[in-house]
Amino acid sequence: MKFFALFIYRPVATILLSVAITLCGILGFRMLPVAPLPQVDFPVIMVSASLPGASPETMASSVATPLERSLGRIAGVSEMTSSSSLGSTRIILQFDFDRDINGAARDVQAAINAAQSLLPSGMPSRPTYRKANPSDAPIMILTLTSDTYSQGELYDFASTQLAPTISQIDGVGDVDVGGSSLPAVRVGLNPQALFNQGVSLDDVRTAISNANVRKPQGALEDGTHRWQIQTNDELKTAAEYQPLIIHYNNGGAVRLGDVATVTDSVQDVRNAGMTNAKPAILLMIRKLPEANIIQTVDSIRARLPELQSTIPAAIDLQIAQDRSPTIRASLEEVEQTLIISVALVILVVFLFLRSGRATIIPAVAVPVSLIGTFAAMYLCGFSLNNLSLMALTIATGFVVDDAIVVLENIARHLEAGMKPLQAALQGTREVGFTVLSMSLSLVAVFLPLLLMGGLPGRLLREFAVTLSVAIGISLLVSLTLTPMMCGWMLKASKPREQKRLRGFGRMLVALQQGYGKSLKWVLNHTRLVGVVLLGTIALNIWLYISIPKTFFPEQDTGVLMGGIQADQSISFQAMRGKLQDFMKIIRDDPAVDNVTGFTGGSRVNSGMMFITLKPRGERSETAQQIIDRLRKKLAKEPGANLFLMAVQDIRVGGRQANASYQYTLLSDDLAALREWEPKIRKKLATLPELADVNSDQEDNGAEMNLIYDRDTMARLGIDVQAANSLLNNAFGQRQISTIYQPMNQYKVVMEVDPRYTQDISALEKMFVINNEGKAIPLSYFAKWQPANAPLSVNHQGLSAASTISFNLPTGKSLSDASAAIDRAMTQLGVPSTVRGSFAGTAQVFQETMNSQVILIIAAIATVYIVLGILYESYVHPLTILSTLPSAGVGALLALQLFNAPFSLIALIGIMLLIGIVKKNAIMMVYFALEAQRHGNLTPQEAIFQACLLRFRPIMMTTLAALFGALPLVLSGGDGSELRQPLGITIVGGLVMSQLLTLYTTPVVYLFFDRLRLRFSRKPKQAVTE
């Protein structure tokens, strides 16, 4: 009593307290970062190693395996995958959430150092690592185009000047430059000219290497001067290499230009990048795992003018893709939804109270509670994101509930003739415990969420804490500011004021009277109501089992990623043509704004595309509908497939897959894996629950096997090393020398001119100089035959792995797909040597599915414990919790009606309903108990009176919560895929709960009261006997 009086009779102090809360909230709001979702990125580090010319199997056994054994000992590694292709290996390490990325990086470097002695000596450089997830979509893509500069020169500008500067910006984890390679001097040898001159490829390599030497020459001194010695020992350009003498034939000099075409070109000609229809260099920028995407993008944009000034004017630097606009638009949509929710909630209050003065009170209390929450969000290190703003939107209905309960009870006393200050004190005292019970039990719902681990726990923590803080501040405001404003602002209603909104008032009275009549009938037919209640429990179980489920709603971020997978024997020239064809198909689509792509590198038969869609306001279709439309057009391209997927704000795992979800096959028997993977993939491709089924197992590439006749080699004076060196010199784009420039180092690359390697007969033109100086054709001691070889070798942990990726067709859920995959694996009878498991997002979905029911039960148990403590009763909490089955039925039916799968967002809605719908029962039970204790009423009379007395606040609080969530259901635009499932769940649950709990709660109350009386009589009877 004294607590309430302290604030009611000291209005200045109360107002200043509220102002302080508001000011702190405004300050916190201005300092909060902006993000699409809470920070849930796993710490990921990528280790890269190269050995030019080495086969995928060689890279896997000699490079990947030693590194994996060393890296696998690092603490906190949750997943380690590797992919080895021609000349390169990439290992992805995913760490536990609580692992510090910088500490992990130090451990990775130590593990690389420990494995160094086990790696091949011919590696041009030590393995390197990057603190970025290569499977993440870039947060920004910059393109360089020019009509005057070559692709190699553009790549040089990008990698030498732009990429290092961008990498230094806070939040940037990796800048990947694609579309070409560094400039180089390329030596294209003519095998016939070499044969005619009697010059071996090794002779050419040695001559070039010896002619380009960078070593110190020292200095000369006399008594007074010192001269630094400088020589022309370096060759910089193709023109300087052409006259180089490599051999003397019959006294005549054989120059490099006589036997080769020397050009200023690039290190690897098998790279291509495009933006729209123009050749381009791409800078794909990825953020650090812990970085804020909006802040990072803003920092990059702020540096762009400076970057532009460092490159020539003839080079056009453009932003091809930026993920931040759709994120900002999504947050603006949520903010608008929040404002609409506040307005609707206040409108509900006005309609019920029919007083402008009374409406001002919750109109002040709601903003104070919501704004004050921003301060706590800042102190907790949160961000303004879709989930935290959705929490505030939902909180609108919650925070007004406390104010409504207090305000309505004070208004009831005023209508009875009590003076304002006395009514404020008496009314607050009566409902203070009710408000406390509602708030604490609602906060209790979120305790299991706060204790939940893994990605779902991280994802929901900000939502739970934000909502809990808003409820806590609302509790404080409703017991301090609200009664003070009521005491000083409200007056007894005058007849003229009571006539306002007479239509709504009469309707409410008629509704209350009709409810009273129906409630009397229900209380006389309690068994029927009990059957209905048991039926809702059974219906809940059936609906939850049958409803389609997924991990997270499929978002339309306005960005698509595409992975090109072509025939494994395709040439680079043909692959570049496929890239151009696919880009034209996509560029012609009316919903596409920009498209960039690249192909080449160590995996010639693959490529990547990044597609920016037009803003949501300029297109009628969703991203998934656009993908469905494009899929039909892309399927007509022969010899290659382009798999499209919408970029999501949440992506789990480090695998670079061509689809959104993955199923990984593991085996310690590589032969068994290669035998069963095609069977499983083909089976999964026939399932209607899956789309775009593809695999990263590529073991059918074209290979030419050379078989040496060692006896003949020995007789001819040729060893295997010389023969292998010949092949590397001829076909391996061998880097034979380094050109040092002030800004970078460039390579001299030697190979047989591509004009002479158009078919297999090129091998017949190759020759080796033996130990007698004679030219011996390769065909004298070797024969060759075509065969198949892997283009890549993949590991997970230390086991051979193959990952099957898939998307979901329209109308299918992840639970449908996972169940279909499990059935298919059973039907195929896959042996125990091949193990299958879901990976990435699909794996997290499986883990979340197993914990959902436990989480809901834990939330209910927590609420029961809190209510039991507050009411000092084992029974009354059960009465209050009896409201939950009807809410669950309403929520699940609404999701099925709107064809929305049960996702993590819908789970939040269910948890919220646990907190919302019990409020009605709390108000009924509290007033019924008070009536029994102080009014000498029977239990049936007490609960009947409590239901009628609290009918208006029950309707107000329910409608306030419903209208607070309704904008989430009706919202469109960016980010609506996240908001709608939450709104649908809450609105559906509230509607069904309101229809049933007004009748089931009184019946359950009487049932438990009779049960209590029956058990209390038995001990007495035993004593008398």
Swiss-Prot record:
What subcellular locations does the record give? Cell inner membrane
Where on the tree of life does the source sit, at the highest rank?
A: Bacteria
Looking at the UniProt entry, the stretches that span the membrane are 3-23, 333-353, 360-380, 387-407, 431-451, 463-483, 528-548, 853-873, 875-895, 897-917, 953-973, 984-1004
Induction of the gene: The mdtABC operon is transcriptionally activated by BaeR.
Annotated membrane topology is: Multi-pass membrane protein
Molecular function as annotated in GO:
xenobiotic transmembrane transporter activity
Report the main location listed first in the record: membrane
Q: Does the keyword RNA-binding apply?
A: no
Q: Which GO terms describe its cellular component?
A: plasma membrane
What does the UniProt keyword field contain? Cell inner membrane, Cell membrane, Membrane, Transmembrane, Transmembrane helix, Transport
Q: Which family does it belong to?
A: Belongs to the resistance-nodulation-cell division (RND) (TC 2.A.6) family. MdtC subfamily.
Q: What does this protein do?
A: The MdtABC tripartite complex confers resistance against novobiocin and deoxycholate.
**HAMAP family per the UniProt record, alphabetical:** MdtC (MF_01424)
Q: How does it assemble?
A: Part of a tripartite efflux system composed of MdtA, MdtB and MdtC. MdtC forms a heteromultimer with MdtB.
- This protein is called Multidrug resistance protein MdtC
Look up and give the organism this protein is from: Escherichia coli O1:K1 / APEC
> What does the organism's lineage look like at the top?
Bacteria, Pseudomonadati, Pseudomonadota, Gammaproteobacteria, Enterobacterales
